[in-house]
Structures are given as structure tokens and as C-alpha cells.
Amino acid sequence: MKKVLGICVLCVSVSLSTNAQNNEFENAYNAFRQQAIKEYEDFREKANKEYADFMRQAWKSYQSLPEIPKPKDEPPVPPTPYPKDDKDKPIKDTPKPYEEVIPITEPEPQPKPVAPIREQSQPEENYFRFTFFQTGCKVRLDESHRFTLKDCQMNTLAEAWERLAGNEYNNAIRDCLELRIHHRLCDWGYLLMLQELSDAYLGRETNESALLCAYLYCQSGYQMRLGMGNNRLYLLVASKHQIYESGYWEIDGMFYYPFNCQEQSLEICGASFPNEQPLSLLVNENPLLVEKPTGSRVLQAEYFPDARANVTSDENLISFFATYPTSMLDDNFCTRWSFYANTPMSERIKKQLYPSLQKTIQGKSQYEAANVLLNFVQTAFVYEYDDKVWGGDRAFFAEESLYYPYCDCEDRSILFSRLVRDLLGLKVLLVYYPGHLATAVCFTDNVTGDYISLNNQKYVVCDPTYIGAPVGATMPDMDNGKAKVILLQ
């Protein structure tokens, strides 16, 4: 009995000792966590204080640089019909030269706040509601958060920034970042959402709206500058991309683009924020918006009638795409097409389009299946020049070609590249010739025809604008000596 009692006492002692150690560890961890949070908050508070101090003095006059015009390409090559007598003739293997390879534009993580922004508990949560492409959104802002600028002077702006930097706006920032995640917003979409929120809350295109938008954008981790001109405040957005047809300012080697500004001369605050990141114009996934179906449209391949689909587009998504600015990277206008081609189609449109195409290509070889998809893009759509329809060059995201009544060679190539990657799982290149855009597919089966050799892999030419042409046929009179190969994800 004494032995059993001794064991029980020992077990209780060990248990108490273990609990004490656990409590000691938990207390140490909580103390460390609170210290880390305080250091983060102190760092962000210090950064905002220094920024406000700079706003009282660090303004310089800048002249905008002239806008970059959209590139004047060679006259577009019209769609050419493939000789029907040659339709079933085999095409021999013919290597094609090219001049340049445009590398893949890899996506990067989106910017994030310079320090974690702590939730501020409130006795009652009040929300401001607004719409973004007809999609309801809400953030924690109420009447007490509204502010008015008495003028557009440095001290007034600095004082307003100091007020915004108080903890009372923390929940609004957190809500905006939550909306970015929930609605799958790219950087461009997030900027548009912040503008819509600020305009709805403080008045469209007011100085107050511009300052709130700039503050939310900056605190989310993005690089921006503030500009003043004719008693108006403007948000200038730093971008990795060179945006066409927009004046811009160059500050410390970075290009800044105006948001709703036509001024040629501005006083610009050169103050920077820690770890700020420029805007990316990559659209890695479609935004999640309330769906507004358009009228239906029947699309059908000429040679493969079973490749037929009835599709309705989403008007809100199409409206979002229409806001997207055309741009390039590294002064290379060929980079722009990959931005469109690498954007996936929405799950909604895939469910309408893909089952019919999958059923038609089921059981076929890669060559046969690619011919079905190629003929679908060649013959289900009406060709027209951008100059005639849009008054200038206008590339489409793949989904836009399913909505608009006309498309050209670049739109067809972007759409075909998307279909092949999604339905066949094969790698695709875009091939730019002066005045024309086509594709080339890396088959894992043995497929013959005109091809491009890259990294010991064979990419067979597929031209969605060479009407009726099979896989492997290059449109006549293409200058491969000046061809540029554009890699896709």
C-alpha cells in the first residue's frame, strides 16, 4: 500500500512539474509574441510618422514624360484560306528559324503590409457598403472616419495622413486585404476596388478620395507617390510595366502613372515607404465577381460539327477586362501578348465550352485533337481588323474572344494557346512574325510539319488564322528570319 501511495505521489509531482514547465513556456511564448507585435506596430507607426514629416517638405516639381504610343506594327496579314486540295496531304518536317526568344514572365507574390496590421476590437461594428463591378463589398468605416481637407497644402495633407495612420483605420485596411483575397483580385483589380471604395465613401474624384485611396494602397504594401496640381491631389502608381498611351513621371528610376490625372506638371512628394512594391499587371486568376450573363452565342467548327458549344459570357468580367491597360516589360512590345495568354479562363466559361470539345477530341491522337481545336478557332469566329473595330490595336484575353463578335490573329492565337494547354496539357509558344501572330505546340507524340526547335524540343506550328490549315502549316510569306518566339506558362 505504501509503495502504491508513493508511486501516486511521484506521478502527481511529475504532473505538477510538467504543468509548471508548460505554463512557463506558454507565458514566455506569449510575452515574446506580444513583444514582436509591439515591435511591428512601432515600426509601422514610425514609418507613417516619418512619411507624414516628409509630406511637409519633400515635394519637387516634375514634368510628365510623353506617353508611349502603342507600337506601329507592320500592316496586319489578312486571314488566308488553306488550299482545300492540300487539306489531307502530309506536311513534311521543316525547321523554321527565329530571331529572338521572349522569356516567361513569372508571377510574384502580391505586396503585403510593411508590418501585420492588428485587428482593433470595437463595441459595435459599422460597415460602409459599396459595389465593385456590381459585386457587393463592405469595409469597417462609419461616419466618424470621414474627413475633409480644407485645402491641398503640404501641412494639411500631412495632418490628414497622421489621422489616417491612427489605429481607427486598421480594420478598414484589413477588410480591403480580405476582399483582395476573397475576390481573387490582381494588383490592377485591387487598385480599382480601392478607388471605387474611396470615391463612394468620400466623393468621386475629390482630394479626400485620392488621399484615402493612396493611404490604403500604400498600407497594403504598394509603391505610390502623391502629386499636387491646380489645387488637386493625385495618386501616382509605380508599375513594373510600361503602360501605353499614358503620360508618366520618372522618379528615382521608377515610372509612376497617374490615376485620373491629365496634368502635365505636378508637385510630387518623393517620400518612400519601407518595402513598397510596384504594381504588376499580370492577371494570374480571374476576379470573383457577381455573375451577369450576357446573351448566348453558338460556336461551331466547320470541319468538326460536333465541336459545338452554346456560351454566355459574364458581363461583369468582360467589363473588368475592358479596363485593363495595355503594357509591356523591358521595352519589348512582344511581352504584352503573354499577359493575356497566361490568364486562365473562368470556371464558368470552361463548364460551357470544354465538355463539347473534350467529347469531340476523346480517343483521338494529339495531332487529331489539336486539329479539332485549331479548326474550331479558325472557323467558329469572324475575323476583323482591330483598326476597323477598335480604332487601334486591342488584344483580347481568351474569354473576350468568346464574347465580342470579331477577333484577329493575336486573339485567335491567345485563345488557341489556352485551349491546347487546358485540354491537351501540352506546352505552347506564341510566334510573332511582322504583322502576324501564330502559335507552335510541343507535342509528345511524333507530329510532323513546320516546326521551331527550342531547348531540344520541337514545337510544331499551328496557325489559327490560316483558315482550314492543319497542324504543321505556316501561312505563306511569313518572315521567319524576323520571327520572335514568346514563351508561355
For each of these PLM feature ranges, what is it?
Residues 36, 40, 44-47, 51, ...:
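Sec/Tat-exported extracytoplasmic proteins
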Residues 224-253, 361-364, 411-489:
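Hydrophobic/aromatic-rich core segments of domains that either
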Residues 196-198, 208, 212-214, 218-358:
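Extended, non-transmembrane interaction/recognition domains
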Residues 30-33, 37, 41-220:
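Long, contiguous, compositionally biased segments that the model treats as domain-scale units
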Residues 143-145, 150-193, 338-404, 465:
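Secondary-structure boundary elements
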Residues 4-14:
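Sec-dependent N-terminal signal peptides
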Residues 200-213, 222, 384-438, 442-444:
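Active-site neighborhood of thiol-dependent amide/isopeptide-bond enzymes
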Residues 20-23:
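Boundary of Sec targeting at the N-terminus
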